[in-house]
Amino acid sequence: FIRNLTLRQEGNTLVLFQFVEKHGKILHDMINDKDSERKVFFVYGGTDTDQRENIRRITEGENDAIIVASYGTFSTGINIKNLHNIIFASPTKSRIRNLQSIGRGLRRNDTKVSCNLYDIGDDMSWKAKKNYTLHHMVERIKIYNEEDFSYKLIKVDL
């Protein structure tokens, strides 16, 4: 689902994930294997600073690049004005991390007037087991309401 959502987006897309091996690398490979025409970058803690800067520079000049990056490396401290879409591919409830991550897409440039955020929340409910993924989504919705963000919830049956 996340791969297909990413590939359907127009413009540059940032996909943020939590765990490098369990999420990020697999997602990067799935996206890259499906579309070899687009530039698809993978950024995590092991990506050196010069390479990150090169990816940032390339993305500023592109209109169809995909960056699959860990929250730790791209949720704060990176300035790419030419981002059109952000996808939260892993659940988190941190207010600061969420707002900083959204801020990646709010940088203005001459051609961009908006940025789309896709915040994915899975309902992994089963019997009486606590569903942290859904709980984190509810916490993020509270943040969006407090910040007066415009959003809509879409249920997707898989």
Where are these regions (language model features)?
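Amphipathic alpha-helical protein-protein interaction surfaces
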Residues: 11, 36, 79-82
